[in-house]
Amino acid sequence: MTADSLPGAGGAVGPCVVQYDVTNPGAEPFTYTITFSLMDEQGRAMSNVEETVASVGAGKTVRRTLEHGGYPGGGVLDAGRVRILDVERVPSDEAPAPASSCPASGLRLTADQGDAAMGLRVVGLHLENCGSRTYSLEGYPVLQLLDAEHQPVDGIEILRGTDGIPMAGGDEGPPRPVTLRPGESAVSGLAWRNTTEFGEAVTVPYVRVRAEAGADPVTVAPHLDLGTTGELGVRPWRKDETGAGRGTGDSGSGRPGAQGPYGMPSSS
């Protein structure tokens, strides 16, 4: 990264501009989500900033600018006060659609940031009908677990329902038909336990999700820390009567907020 000070209004020195480069070494376009930590002069983390760089072409490098006028650390923000906490990348044609757009399918599929307590992990999946026609589905999302290189992860049993996941509730019942009119949403979810015993712990950074068999895939980044359990529970689609699933964040990753039909965080 490189940094340059830019003049503010009236010629005053404004907040420093930090520029960063994103290089895609892959053979297809990727969309990157980068989380930056902004620090004060003592190196203490003050705030995090998340930026999405869409559709970086194969073998290409793009330069972007990180501007944070509300920098809380005092003084001038420069590259020495910025750290990269996390980088996620997904194929651009499988990236979650931002709230400002609607895919050709008329369905926007996203994952929220989830919740964790006493070894139990849950991540909500949200399906919004952002199109102009009614959409019906029944059953479970179709999942494919992927490693950091987007290759399939084997050896994990995907359970239909969460009865087999201790403390996950397991009260969702069998699948039933869901009808979504334009503007309505459905919610599903992933549940697992971060238990590590004998054997090698497994972490799954990415999950390719289809709302149902044959639907367009969307790759989300829930970072499943499965430990040595070898199991992941998936809940059936239910209509989101709270309306909380409407309008996810710009990067397509919702934020914990109102409770959905499974008592999990829903995007706001």
Predicted regions and their residues:
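Short beta-strands and strand-coil junctions in structured, solvent-facing domains, enriched
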Residues: 131-134, 195-197
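Terminal connector regions
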Residues: 49-50, 63-65, 69-108, 193-238, ...
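Intrinsically disordered, low-complexity Pro/Gly/Ser/Thr-rich segments with frequent PxxP/GP/PP motifs
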Residues: 43-74, 160-195
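Ordered, small/hydrophobic-rich secondary-structure cores
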Residues: 1-63
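Short acidic, flexible loop segments centered on an aromatic residue
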Residues: 27-44, 137-153, 157-161
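Short, solvent-exposed loop/turn segments enriched in Ser/Thr/Gly
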Residues: 12-19, 117-124, 203
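Asparagine-centered strand-capping/turn motif at beta-strand->loop junctions
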Residues: 21-26, 125-131
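A structural motif detector for short, solvent-exposed N-terminal "entry" segments of globular domains
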Residues: 98-124, 128
